[in-house]
Every structure is written in C-alpha cells, then in structure tokens.
A protein has these predicted regions:
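Amphipathic alpha-helical hairpins/coiled-coils and adjacent low-complexity
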Residues: 1-86
Length: 86
C-alpha cells in the first residue's frame, strides 16, 4: 500500500467516523427525548421496575457519550497520523 493509498484510506475513515458521529448524536437526541418522557412518567414511582428503568436509561446515556468520545479519539488519532504522513 502506497502513502497515497494510506492517506486516501484515512480520509475515507474520517468521513465514515463523521457519519457515525452524526448517527450516534441522533440516537442520543432521541434517547434524551425518550428519557425525559420516561422520567416524567415515573417521577413519583418508587417501584423496583421504575428504578431499574431509570438506571437503564442513565446507562444508555452514558454509553452514547462514551461512543461519541471513542469516535472523537479515533478521528483525532487518524488525523494525527494523516498529518504525520504529510
């Protein structure tokens, strides 16, 4: 694989990561909307199921944030390597 091919592959990967970020951000937005509705609905509920649902939503929100951080780190790493290639 030539340097040019590596650069092209890195550029394509960066574009795919942008698409992935957009998708995950959309999922996060939908999740936040659903979480607000769920939390409002379960506001006064002390049932175990309600607490499990609250924890599950909080975990899902954390996972979305983690996925976005991983995408950012991957893109930054690829960009750094691309710059190092010249």
């Amino acid at each position: 694989m030539s340097i040019g091919e590596v650069k092209a592959a890195l550029d394509e990967a960066s574009q795919l990561l942008d698409q992935g970020r957009t998708t995950v951000e959309g999922i996060g937005d939908s999740l936040n909307e659903a979480a607000e509705l769920m939390l409002a609905t379960l506001h006064d509920s002390g049932r175990d199921e309600a607490e499990k649902a609250r924890r599950a939503v909080a975990e899902a929100v954390r996972e979305v944030k983690l996925a976005l951080r991983v995408i950012t780190a991957a893109q930054e790493s690829g960009d750094d390597f691309r710059r190092a290639l010249g």
